[in-house]
Structures are given as structure tokens and as C-alpha cells.
């Protein structure tokens, strides 16, 4: 799909146009002009009750009197001044469904007339593009017979003026690219997407951007570094663990401290010796959702060429049962030197992450954000709507909350205090790898915090938001929009 910004006179439109109508029958500015051109044609339709302006209602008009456009899509915009982001995205979804049902190849959208509550033109256009891209995404690489998509639409033009509108399109396209990249990797089956495959994707990204350099550490490299907790998780798998470092450097000051994003990359997690239930185990291919999202973010910022230094780290690994697998009761010495008693081999993500969080100290980062499908407890607490946010730095937490609100990629901050460290005490080691039944998402974050004292740190638990279940089963690409928005804000000083 191609997206463009162009100030277009209504009278000059020959193809297809999208305009808005409010629930009380009030016409948007563009609809009002067409009503005047057509000598009250739209007003007559409103009076007859053929269109009511109900949110998401779409009426397709052809042969509008005195008007040369092939089709006019009249879209119900609900109550004027009350439409929120979620409603606007649904409006766009309903509109694109109506357009796709026709043979329209090009549409010119005047929905920039529609005011989203507490938002401006930038967000109107950006949400439009992001929603359109979500609606057309399909993952069919492994189907012998592809879906028949008889969709003619190839061009969407936003009738607007100024740099803000073009910036919205540019940002949205880059974010959509990142989301798509994250989805493609996460949806890939685990017999294909193993740690080596993840590393190959990282290397391929470096070939597509001159701003990126990739380094991959294998198990021998990690053993030499003392990353024993990470390696213990991998012991049960024949597929070697891979730690992929994607270095993006484009800051005006080449020595500027980097922002580091760490993604948990368990390409399959059977739970190890503490085996998971069979039902739903196929979804554990999504346990690399953190690494997938970091990979997606790196794609997006390379497209945007943000003036930042950012390092994306994909901590690839598998957790499988085997005669060589690590066991409950094992005590592991981490790269940091702290010892950890393994009480549950299915609490493996924190073991992979703790060594990775220690490893990234060498970059002297400005800040570190780890992203992980870490705990079922986070899903119980927040459901599938909000990612869990934990941080030892209030400023960083607030910046992430702002980016979450701006992008509508929601996150909710969870508490973190010394009392949660009490739950991680072990009689035999410095730490236990689980903290008991209560507050599991928080104790997981508390565990990780023991390895982050050298920098500002935040943790995003995306166990509930990384993929969907049911009829729409598949990766969501979250929290790519949140993280890219955070980086845009960092680049612009907001």
C-alpha cells in the first residue's frame, strides 16, 4: 500500500473520496462542500434516514449530482468532539472494509476533518495508516494455498497540508514496518525460528542499513564470559543459544551513550524439566515476543534514521526437557557473580535476561529497557490490554508511560520495593529464581533489578500483549509502537 499527503481540491477529484458525517446529522467541512456542490444531496439522505452518522456506518455513493468523483464514501463519525482513539481506529477499520469491497484503486481521505478527542492532525493521519496496515497484514508463508485477496486498493492519499501530515505518514509507515517485522518473526514456527534463525534476521538487517552493525555471540563466547545462567537454560536443546547484538549508531555525537533494548528470545519454551501443560503449549513459540519486538524496533528506527545510538539485543535460546537439561535444585553462578537456586525451570526467562543485563554494562548505556513475555502472573493482573511496566527510575517510567499513552500501546506501572526481594531469598544461594505464588510479575521484575545497578532500567512484561488467542490468533507486534514512540521522543527531546 502506498500512502501520500496531497492538498487536493474537492472539485478536482475523479477517483474516490472519503468524507465524515456526525451522528446529529452535522456535516464535516469536506462533506458540507460536497453537499453544496450536489445541491443538498447529502442533506436529503440524512433527512430520509438513509445515513445517520452512527460511528462506523459507511454509505457508498455513486453518481453524486454535479460531482465527478467515482465514489463517495460517507463515514459515520459518531458524536462530534467525543470520538476517542479506539473509536477512530474502529472507524478507519470499518471504512477500509467498505473500500476493499469495491474495485477502488485509489482513495482520497478527508477524514482529517474528524477531530479525535485531545489529538491533532498528526495523530489522525498516523492512526489511519497504522490501522490500515494492521488490517491488511497476513502471515501465510507456510500455507500451500494462499488466501485469494481480490483487493484493488493500492493508493491512499490524505488531503492535508504541511510537514506535520507528511511526518505522520513517515512515522506510521516506519512503525508499521517494525510491527510487521516483529509479527513475521514471532509467527514463524519454532522448527524454523530457532536461536540461529533469530541471529540470521539480525544479520540480514545489517545488510539493509548502513547505520547498523550486527555481532552474534555463540555458546562458547558466552561460556568464556561466565554467562552460566543463560547457558543453563539452553542445555536441554540441540539448537545453540545465540546472543545477537544489533548496533544502530546515528547520533551527531558518535560517543553519545546508547539506549539499550534487551529482548527475551525463547524461540520455544516447553518449561524444561518443570514441563508446561500440553494444552496451549504451541503458543510458547511466542516466548520470543520480546526479541521479536526489539528486532521490529530496530527495523523501524533504521527506516526513520533517528539521531540516536541504540543497541538492540536478541537473547535467543530454547528451554526443553532432556537428559542434559538443567534441574530444579540446581545452583547457577551468574555473570554478575550472584548465585541463583533454580526452584522452577519454567522461570527461565529471568535467567537468560539476568546475564544479558549484566553483559550490556560494557556499553555504558544511557538506559536499558528489557522486553519479555516473562510471567503468566502479569496476564492475570493486567489481561491482554496493558503491558506490565516495572522500573527503578521514576523519570524513565514516566517517559515510557507517556509513549504508551501517545501510541495507544498501553502499559501499566507495577510497584517495586524491598519487600518483594524478601520473597526471593534462598537458604542455599543468593537468590531463588521464583518468589512464591503472590505478586509473580513483580517478583520477576525484582529478580531482574538485582542485575541493573549500573544504569537506569525499566522492564516491560508483555506476556499478555505479545499475541492474540482465538479466531485472531497471532502475534500483535506490541510493544513496537510504544518503544518507537519512546525513541522518537528521546530523539526530539520531548
From Swiss-Prot:
It comes from the Bacteria. Mn(2+) 2 binds at residues 264, 269, 287, 348. The keyword Metal-binding applies. Its EC number is 3.4.11.1, 3.4.11.10. It holds the Pfam family Peptidase_M17_N. Its cofactor is Mn(2+). It is found in: Cytoplasm. One of its GO terms (biological process) is proteolysis. Binds 2 manganese ions per subunit. Keywords: Aminopeptidase, Cytoplasm, Hydrolase, Manganese, Metal-binding, Protease. GO terms for cellular component: cytoplasm. Its main location: cytoplasm. Mn(2+) 1 binds at residues 269, 346, 348. It catalyses: Release of an N-terminal amino acid, Xaa-|-Yaa-, in which Xaa is preferably Leu, but may be other amino acids including Pro although not Arg or Lys, and Yaa may be Pro. Amino acid amides and methyl esters are also readily hydrolyzed, but rates on arylamides are exceedingly low; Release of an N-terminal amino acid, preferentially leucine, but not glutamic or aspartic acids. One of its GO terms (molecular function) is manganese ion binding. PROSITE patterns: CYTOSOL_AP. The active site is at 276, 350. Coiled coil: none annotated. NCBIfam families: PRK00913.1-4. HAMAP family: Cytosol_peptidase_M17. Belongs to the peptidase M17 family. Presumably involved in the processing and regular turnover of intracellular proteins. Catalyzes the removal of unsubstituted N-terminal amino acids from various peptides. This is Probable cytosol aminopeptidase. It comes from Pasteurella multocida (strain Pm70). The lineage of its organism: Bacteria, Pseudomonadati, Pseudomonadota, Gammaproteobacteria, Pasteurellales.
Amino acid at each position: 500500500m502506498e500512502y501520500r499527503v496531497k492538498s487536493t481540491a474537492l472539485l478536482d477529484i475523479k477517483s474516490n473520496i472519503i468524507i465524515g458525517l456526525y451522528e446529529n446529522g452535522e456535516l464535516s467541512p469536506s462533506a458540507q462542500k460536497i453537499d453544496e456542490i450536489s445541491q443538498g444531496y447529502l442533506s436529503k439522505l440524512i433527512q430520509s434516514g438513509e445515513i445517520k452518522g452512527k460511528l462506523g456506518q459507511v454509505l457508498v455513493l455513486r453518481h453524486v449530482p454535479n460531482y465527478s468523483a467515482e465514489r463517495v464514501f460517507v463515514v459515520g463519525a459518531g458524536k462530534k468532539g467525543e470520538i476517542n482513539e479506539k473509536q477512530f481506529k474502529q472507524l478507519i477499520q470499518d471504512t477500509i472494509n467498505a473500500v476493499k469491497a469495491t474495485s477502488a484503486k485509489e482513495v482520497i481521505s478527508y477524514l482529517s476533518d474528524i477531530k479525535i478527542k485531545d489529538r491533532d492532525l498528526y495523530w489522525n493521519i498516523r492512526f489511519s495508516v497504522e490501522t490500515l496496515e494492521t488490517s491488511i497484514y497476513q502471515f501465510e508463508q507456510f500455507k500451500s494455498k494462499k488466501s485469494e485477496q481480490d483487493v484493488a486498493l493500492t493508493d491512499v492519499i490524505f488531503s492535508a497540508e504541511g510537514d506535520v501530515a507528511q511526518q505522520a505518514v513517515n512515522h506510521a509507515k516506519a512503525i508499521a514496518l517494525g510491527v510487521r517485522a516483529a509479527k513475521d518473526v514471532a509467527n514463524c514456527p519454532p522448527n524454523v525460528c530457532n536461536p540461529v534463525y533469530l541471529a540470521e534476521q539480525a544479520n540480514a538487517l545489517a545488510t539493509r542499513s548502513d547505520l547498523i552493525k550486527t555481532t552474534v555471540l555463540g555458546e562458547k563466547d558466552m561460556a568464556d564470559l561466565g554467562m552460566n545462567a543463560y547457558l543453563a537454560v539452553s542445555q536441554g536443546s540441540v539448537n545453540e543459544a545465540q546472543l545477537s547484538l544489533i548496533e544502530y549508531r546515528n547520533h551527531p555525537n558518535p560517543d553519545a551513550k546508547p539506549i539499550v533494548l534487551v529482548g527475551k528470545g525463547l524461540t520455544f519454551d516447553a518449561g524444561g524439566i518443570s514441563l508446561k501443560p500440553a494444552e496451549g503449549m504451541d503458543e510458547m513459540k511466542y516466548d520470543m515476543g520480546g526479541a521479536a519486538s526489539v528486532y521490529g524496533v530496530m527495523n523501524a528506527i533504521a527506516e526513520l534514521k533517528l539521531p540516536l545510538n541504540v543497541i538492540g539485543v536478541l537473547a535467543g535460546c530454547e528451554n526443553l526437557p532432556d537428559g542434559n537439561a538443567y534441574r530444579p535444585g540446581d545452583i547457577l553462578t551468574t555473570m554478575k557473580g550472584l548465585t541463583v537456586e533454580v526452584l522452577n525451570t519454567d522461570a527461565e526467562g529471568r535467567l537468560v535476561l539476568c546475564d544479558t543485563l549484566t553483559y550490556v554494562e560494557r556499553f555504558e548505556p544511557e538506559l536499558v529497557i528489557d522486553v519479555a513475555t516473562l510471567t503468566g502472573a502479569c496476564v492475570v493482573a493486567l489481561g491482554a490490554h496493558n503491558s506490565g511496566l516495572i522500573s527503578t527510575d521514576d523519570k524513565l517510567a514516566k517517559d515510557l508511560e507517556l509513549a504508551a499513552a501517545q501510541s495507544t500501546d498501553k502499559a501499566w506501572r507495577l510497584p517495586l520495593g524491598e519487600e518483594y526481594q524478601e520473597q526471593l531469598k534462598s537458604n542455599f544461594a543468593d537468590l531463588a529464581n521464583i518468589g512464591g505464588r503472590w505478586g509473580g510479575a513483580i517478583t520477576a521484575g525484582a529478580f531482574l533489578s538485582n542485575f541493573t545497578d549500573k544504569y537506569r532500567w525499566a522492564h516491560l512484561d508483555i506476556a499478555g500483549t505479545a499475541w492474540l488467542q482465538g479466531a485472531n490468533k497471532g502475534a500483535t507486534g506490541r510493544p513496537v509502537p510504544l518503544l518507537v514512540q519512546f525513541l522518537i521522543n528521546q530523539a526530539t527531546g520531548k
